[in-house]
């Protein structure tokens, strides 16, 4: 039984046991493009990946399943070497603690996503990045593009082109790196981890 066959079973909920860790060769492989029209198996896998992210961000389900909270998941992280990523970025509460009008600033499963253009300006998260496939803290600025234009297909086989900036751009770049065999710490300057080149945007 392939990893995907196990993951898409109706009763299966993706948990931390399904997520492979650094050292596994799947994380360093360039994943294969999915074919269109999408197979039911690839659609279900995308839905399961999104379900995992929602569970991971839910305090009750997260604790029940022992999940680390995540905002993105790429198919290679669950040992399926395909170009599929899921992104779920929640909007914050307002200054008075009221819930946001829109729960998520980005909620999408992207098939065969690719960056078609990007800004000259770089950006990095002030607190660095983490990864569900990396069980250790790696400090430093993960240098990325401040703005990107991404093309992808959705589960209905429809093509989209979106412009992203800020945190959403960072998350999508992190996940696209996964389908290209790149891990976040590859983008940290090993000699000077917190080097900020002139003009680089540091996102708090």
UniProtKB/Swiss-Prot annotation:
It comes from the Bacteria. GO terms for molecular function: metal ion binding; peptide deformylase activity. It is an enzyme of class 3 (hydrolase). It comes from Streptococcus equi subsp. zooepidemicus (strain MGCS10565). The keyword Metal-binding applies. Binds 1 Fe(2+) ion. The active site is at residue 175. Belongs to the polypeptide deformylase family. One of its GO terms (biological process) is translation. Removes the formyl group from the N-terminal Met of newly synthesized proteins. Requires at least a dipeptide for an efficient rate of reaction. N-terminal L-methionine is a prerequisite for activity but the enzyme has broad specificity at other positions. Keywords: Hydrolase, Iron, Metal-binding, Protein biosynthesis. Its EC number is 3.5.1.88. Gene3D superfamilies: Peptide deformylase (3.90.45.10). Its cofactor is Fe(2+). This is Peptide deformylase. Fe cation binds at residues 131, 174, 178. The keyword Repressor does not apply.
């Amino acid at each position: 039984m392939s990893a995907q066959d196990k993951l898409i079973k109706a009763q299966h909920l993706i948990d931390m046991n399904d997520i492979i860790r650094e050292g596994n060769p799947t994380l360093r492989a360039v994943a294969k493009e999915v074919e269109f029209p999408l197979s039911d198996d690839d659609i279900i896998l995308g839905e399961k990946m999104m379900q995992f992210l929602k569970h991971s961000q839910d305090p009750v389900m997260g604790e029940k399943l022992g999940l680390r909270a995540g905002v993105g998941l790429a198919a290679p992280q669950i040992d399926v070497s395909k170009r599929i990523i899921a992104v779920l970025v929640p909007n914050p509460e307002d200054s008075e603690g009221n819930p946001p009008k829109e729960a998520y600033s980005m909620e999408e499963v992207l098939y065969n996503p690719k960056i078609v253009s990007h800004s000259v300006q770089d950006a990095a998260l002030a607190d660095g990045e983490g990864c569900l496939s990396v069980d250790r803290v790696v400090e430093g600025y993960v240098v990325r593009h401040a703005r990107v234009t991404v093309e992808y297909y959705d589960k209905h086989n429809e093509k989209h082109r979106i412009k992203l900036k800020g945190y959403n751009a960072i998350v999508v770049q992190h996940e696209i790196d996964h389908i290209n065999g790149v891990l976040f710490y590859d983008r940290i300057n090993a000699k000077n981890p917190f080097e900020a080149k002139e003009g680089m945007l540091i996102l708090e």
